[in-house]
Structure formats: C-alpha cells, structure tokens
C-alpha cells in the first residue's frame, strides 16, 4: 500500500532531532510493508528567524528534496506569519502547494494520507485527499489541542479540519478526552512507541556514591530555549540540591542526533523533566530504557508508568529535589518495564488494524 505522510515537522539534514516522533511513525508504516513518502511543508523564512524556536533550526536553507532513513522527503515552502494573525493567508498558501506536491509525486499515487499535526498542514492533506478521493488520518501530538484551540485565530480551523478527517489519532488519553469534549467522534488513541535501539538498552542503575558529597549529573532532556520546557525550574532544583551538599552538573540537549542523546542518557544519574506542557514525553521513556531514572512533574502521561516517588505534583524546586534524592535511594535491581502499549510491536498492530478498518470503510 502507498501511504503519504504529511507533517509540519520532520528531521532535516541539518537538524536530525526535529520531529523524530514522525520519522518513528514512518518507520512503523514501512515495517508493515507499505511504501511511504513524506511531505514536510516548511515556512518561508530567513536564517536569523530560525532562532525563534529550536524546531525551526535548519529550515531556512533546507533542501527541497532529500532522503531520511531511505524515505523520500519533499519540503515545499508556504507563507505563514508568527502567531498566525492572518490564517487565511496560510490556508491559501498551503492549498497552493498541492500542485507542487502532485508534480513531485508524478505517477505515484497514495492510497492513504497520514497527517501529523492539524494546523496548518491538514489543509494540504485534506485538499489532496479530496483530489484523489482517498481517506486521510490526522495525528494530534498535543500542540493543536493544548495551544491551537486556545488561539482565536486558529481554533475554528483546527476544529473544522479535525472533523473533516476520516480518523483522528491522539497520542494520549487526555488528548482523546479533549477531542470528545470538542464533539469529535472519530478518534482513537495510539501512543508513540519507544524507539531506543538494543545497543543502548539497559536496566536502571543504583546510586553508589557518597551521599550529598558526590557529583550528580542531571540531564535536562530538552532545548532550554523552549519556554514550555521550563528550564528555569530545573536550574532552581539543581540549586536546591547544591544547598544540600551535592555537586551538580546539568546537561541539556540541543538538536543532537538520537544516538548522542541516548549516550548522554546512559551516563546521567537522573533525568529531570519540568515541562509546563507535554502530551507523551518520549524522553522520559527513552531515559528509562537507557537505564537512567526519571524525576518528573506530573505532566502528560508520565503518571501511567513512572513510580509514585518519581512524580511531583507541584512545580516546586524543593519537592523536585526531594524526589531526586528518593530516586537515588531506591533499589533498581529488579529493573523497570514500560507498559506494553508503548512497545513497537503493540503500536505496529494498532496501526495495522486502523489501516485495515479505514480500507474496509472506503
């Protein structure tokens, strides 16, 4: 089966950390025996404008055609202003690039479109699906519902596109509840699988140093420039640990390849997550698979699998520091296993069932 993946974010040649959760999904579809091609519309911008957000790094000079993991990628440009004050401009621009997409695909015609994120790329997915009379699926990872629905400029467009999709996939139950509250009936939950390669997989390790006298390597698994990641709270937590005698070193992640990310998870003592907004943070699960315990505020779906002593309900440095010390005291000899719903095999079966059901309905 030929499947076209449309996404606002996808790894670029100069920013391979961008949109890895989408390339993971492309890998799942490929493993099912489907032929996959990717459309990654990019906003027109100058080099200096990339500094607005880490996910924009590499966008200005990105090639129009490239390959990532043996998957062909086409990156047409569209017009869009920061904050989308004129959404109609973005909509018209997104619809216009359907011609260049059709030309790039040539004789290759998809039988299904999988669109990651709704605004604004679902405008393109919806137009192409109508043009070829095929079903399309929208995958919501969080931003569309958590931020987009609160924005008066985009909320109506997001709801309209979500209801026009043949199926909505959310990556967490919380997002599915939002979809239900908005009157979206054709939705289901498929988690993002944990894609750590076997070479990096190990059991969580126990702390063996001198209590409150040794160096602690804390991993903050995000780019500190992203405000929703709440880097300041992580720094406050580390300061609190230092007042207790710990010598704290903090490592952050800035667009590193996944293998380097996993290497850093292997050597860290604790991974600290302080985000204000998450749907299903991959880094928490990846860290656990790489053998590094995780302390996190209760955000996204981390409460589904993290032990209670690893979770902090309040965004307070002292309580996060207490949780880190509890994690260091814990005996991890018995290991740690994630729920089956985050495994590659489970997610693969869910996508197989979804695709089969869609084909039966059309």
Task: Report the location of each language-model feature.
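Short hydrophobic beta-strand element within catalytic cores of glycosyltransferases
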Residues: 293-296
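Donor nucleotide-sugar binding/catalytic pocket of nucleotide-sugar-dependent glycosyltransferases
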Residues: 40, 158-202
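Conserved acidic donor-binding segment of nucleotide-sugar-dependent glycosyltransferases
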Residues: 309-318, 325-330
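Aromatic "clamp/platform" in nucleotide-sugar-dependent glycosyltransferases that forms part
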Residues: 276
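A charged, aromatic-enriched C-terminal amphipathic alpha-helix characteristic of glycosyltransferases
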Residues: 206, 228, 329-360
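N-terminal subdomain of nucleotide-sugar transferases
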Residues: 1-61
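Conserved donor-binding/catalytic core segment of Leloir-type glycosyltransferases
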Residues: 4, 209-229, 235-238
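Acidic anion/phosphate-binding donor-loop and adjacent secondary structure
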Residues: 149-152, 180, 195-213
């Amino acid at each position: 089966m030929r499947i076209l993946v449309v996404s606002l974010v996808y790894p670029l040649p100069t920013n391979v950390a961008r949109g890895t959760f989408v390339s993971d999904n492309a890998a799942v579809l490929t493993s099912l025996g489907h032929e996959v091609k990717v459309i990654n519309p990019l906003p027109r911008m100058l080099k200096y404008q990339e500094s607005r957000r880490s996910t924009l790094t590499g966008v200005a000079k990105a090639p129009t055609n490239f390959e990532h993991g043996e998957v062909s990628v086409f990156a047409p440009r569209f017009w869009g202003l920061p904050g989308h004050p004129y959404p109609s401009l973005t909509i018209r621009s997104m619809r216009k690039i359907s011609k260049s997409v059709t030309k790039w695909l040539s004789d290759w015609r998809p039988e299904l479109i999988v669109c990651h994120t709704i605004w604004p790329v679902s405008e393109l997915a919806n137009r192409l699906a109508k043009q070829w009379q095929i079903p399309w699926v929208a995958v919501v990872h969080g931003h569309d519902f958590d931020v987009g629905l609160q924005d008066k400029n985009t909320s109506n467009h997001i709801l309209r596109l979500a209801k026009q999709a043949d199926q909505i996939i959310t990556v967490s139950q919380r997002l599915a509840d939002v979809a239900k509250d908005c009157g979206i009936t054709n939705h289901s939950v498929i988690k993002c699988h944990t894609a750590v390669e076997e070479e990096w997989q190990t059991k969580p390790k126990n702390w063996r140093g001198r209590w409150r006298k040794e160096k602690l390597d804390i991993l903050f698994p995000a780019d500190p420039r992203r405000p929703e990641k709440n880097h300041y709270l992580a720094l406050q937590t580390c300061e609190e640990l230092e007042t207790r005698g710990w010598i704290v070193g903090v490592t952050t992640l800035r667009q590193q390849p996944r293998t380097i990310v996993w290497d850093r998870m292997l050597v860290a003592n604790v991974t600290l997550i302080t985000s204000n907004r998450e749907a299903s943070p991959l880094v928490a699960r990846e860290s656990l698979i790489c053998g590094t315990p995780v302390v996190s505020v209760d955000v996204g779906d981390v409460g589904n699998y993290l032990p209670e002593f690893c979770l902090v309900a309040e965004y307070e440095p002292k309580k996060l520091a207490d949780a880190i010390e509890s994690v260091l005291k814990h005996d991890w000899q018995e290991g740690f296993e994630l729920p089956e719903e985050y495994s590659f095999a489970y997610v693969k079966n869910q996508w197989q069932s979804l695709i089969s059901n869609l084909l039966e309905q059309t």
